[in-house]
């Protein structure tokens, strides 16, 4: 069966993730790929490209990353080729999660790749990493992702409400990180992050939230997340971090959660 495909060539830079995401969304719209499959593919490609840029070495940065998107029937796929050091995410052994809530989690990207895709295959060919990821995408659909934005309000001197819009990924997480740092430096110790308009979160975004929660713990404050969309909540479940955060169904409940006495941190 013949299908549709497009080829994308990018330099090994994190800034290119935005262009890839735009191509995936455009291809998805043209091919009527269901929105959940487009979202999952963009999370996975964010993780793959970020890993190549950060850990692929000089050989990866000296050559383009080649991506082929395709849809054949219900199969939505991406093949990624890079010249970085060999790395097989299929064979990589992920250690068990650490029970210490203050330690930064690792291997989130590999977890997302394995969990979100129905097929993950790797081979090394002519000094090139070739990674194929594919997802069954039955049916038709469209996806509209709002542009990234952060809106902040201050209920009181020590609290802030941060509403996120769009995607929290490799190219946008630094904006949230700097905004949260600025709030904490100004004396804020309680932060609500509203995820109602957040379409997806990659591992870089999870780490910003985790480190913020850890910092607020140290200050005797609290981070509360509210209104997560089902796809975002699923990513928290996959990451194993669902129990590391306080969740609320809406802003009012989040404000009430901030007023509850804090449990003492384990010694």
Cite the ranges covered by each PLM segment.
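Helix-loop-beta hinge of the Bergerat
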Residues: 3-35, 180
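Amphipathic alpha-helical interaction surfaces in cytosolic regulatory modules
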Residues: 49, 83, 167-245
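STAS-typified acidic loop motif
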Residues: 7-19, 147-178, 195-199
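Conserved beta-strand core positions
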Residues: 63-65, 76, 131, 148, ...
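A charged, well-structured terminal subsegment
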Residues: 247-267
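Conserved short strand/loop->alpha-helix "switch" segment adjacent to the catalytic nucleotide/phosphoryl-transfer site
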Residues: 22-46, 101-105
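Conserved beta-strand-loop-beta-strand hairpin that lines the nucleotide-binding pocket
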Residues: 1-7, 52-144, 238, 245
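Conserved catalytic core of two-component sensor histidine kinases
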Residues: 38, 42, 114, 177, ...
């Amino acid at each position: 069966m013949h299908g549709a495909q497009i080829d994308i060539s990018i330099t090994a830079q994190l800034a290119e993730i935005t262009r890839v995401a735009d191509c995936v969304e455009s291809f998805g719209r043209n091919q009527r790929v269901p929105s959940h499959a487009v979202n999952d593919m963009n999370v996975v490609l964010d993780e793959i490209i970020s890993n190549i840029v950060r850990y692929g070495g000089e050989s990866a940065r000296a050559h383009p990353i080649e991506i082929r998107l395709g849809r054949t029937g219900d199969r939505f796929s991406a093949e990624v080729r890079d010249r970085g050091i060999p790395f097989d995410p299929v064979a990589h052994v992920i250690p068990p999660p650490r029970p210490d809530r203050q330690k930064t989690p690792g291997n989130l990207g590999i977890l997302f790749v394995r969990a979100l895709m129905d097929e993950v295959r790797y081979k090394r060919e002519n000094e090139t990493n070739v990674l194929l990821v594919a997802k069954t995408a039955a049916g038709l659909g469209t996806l509209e992702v709002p542009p990234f934005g952060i809106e902040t309000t201050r209920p009181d001197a020590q609290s802030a409400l941060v509403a996120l819009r769009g995607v929290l990924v490799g190219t946008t997480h630094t904006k949230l990180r700097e905004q949260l740092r600025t709030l904490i430096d100004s004396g804020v110790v309680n932060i609500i992050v509203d995820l109602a308009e957040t379409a997806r979160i990659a591992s870089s975004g999870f780490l910003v939230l985790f480190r913020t929660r850890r910092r607020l713990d140290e200050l005797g404050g609290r981070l509360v997340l509210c209104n997560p969309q089902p796809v975002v909540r699923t990513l928290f479940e996959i990451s194993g971090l669902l129990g590391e955060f306080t969740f609320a169904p809406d802003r009012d409940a989040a404000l009430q959660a901030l007023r509850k006495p804090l449990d003492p941190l384990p010694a």
